[in-house]
Amino acid sequence: MPLVTSKEMFEKAYNGGYAIGAFNVNNMEIIQGITEAAAELKAPLILQVSKGARAYANRTYLKKLVEAAVIETGLPIVLHLDHGDSFELCKSCIEDGFTSVMIDASSKPFAENIALTRQVVEYARDHGVVVEAELGTLAGIEDEVNVSAEDSSYTRPEEVEEFVSKTGCDSLAIAIGTSHGAYKFKPGTKPQLRFDVLEEVSRRLPGFPIVLHGSSSVPQDLVAKVNQYGGNMPGAIGVPEDQLRKAASLSVCKINIDSDLRLAMTASIREHFALHPADFDPRQYLKPARQAIKELVTHKIVDVLGCDGKAF
C-alpha cells in the first residue's frame, strides 16, 4: 500500500466519532514504536514531520523510514508536514512525496493567512495533496514554533466559514486552549478546553474535519520518572485525556501528539542509564525506549483517540 492522503480517513473519523493520531517523528526508533503499536491495533496513522525534524534527520532518510513503515505494516499512513511556515517549504515537501501539508500562517493578519493558504492549496491540488490550515494561535514552544501567551489567541468562529471558503483547505486547526510543549497550564489551575468554541466552529462547518495541535497529555508518571532520574521538569502539565476523548467524539478528526513521545523516550533512557551505568551500546537503551513509545501510542489509540480497528 502506498502513502495515502487523510481525506478518506477524516470522513470515516468524523462519521465514526473518533480521531486519528498525528504523531511527530524524527528518528527510526520513534517511527518503529508508533507503527508497531498501530499495526497491532489496526489503526490508521498520520506520521508528521516538522521543519526541524526534516533538517535534523535529513529529508531523504526520514522519507525512506516512513516508506519502510508502510511496507512493514501495510497500514494506511499519511506523511504530513507539520507547521509549514512558507509556500517554499510546503512545495518542497509535496515534491518529496508528502501526501499532506500544513501551512501555518495563523500569526499573520486574516487576509494574508487566506492568501498564503490559498497559494499552497492551489499547488497541492495539482499534485493530489491535501492541505491543513490554521486559524487562531497556540501558545508554547515546540521545534520551530515559539509563541508567547500574550501573542496567542482563540479561534474566532465567525471567521471560519469565510476562511475555508476562500482558501479551499481540507482541514482546519483551531485554538481552543491547547498549547505546544510540556507546560500547557499553570500549576494549580484546572485545565479546561473551550468546547463552546469547538461546538460553534462545528455548527458553522458541518462535516468539516477539525484539528487540535498541542494535544499531549504530559503523563505525570513519565514526568516523575524523568525527574527521579536526574531531570528537571517542575510544573509540566498537559491536556486531560478525557477532554481529548470528548473532542475526538465531536468534530476533531486529527489530534497532534509530540511532547508525550519525547517524554516516554527520555524517561526510558534516563532510567536505563541510572540502572545500567556501564552500558554504552545504543541498542541497549534505544530498544526499551522504542518499547516505551509503543506502549504510549497503544494507550493513546485505544483510550484517547478511539481509532483502533479503523484502518481498513
What are these regions (language model features)?
Residues 228-231, 239-312:
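C-terminal alpha-helical cap/extension of soluble enzyme domains
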Residues 5-21, 279-280:
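Generic N-terminal amphipathic, Lys/Arg-enriched alpha-helix
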Residues 212-218:
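Long, repeat-rich segments with strong aromatic
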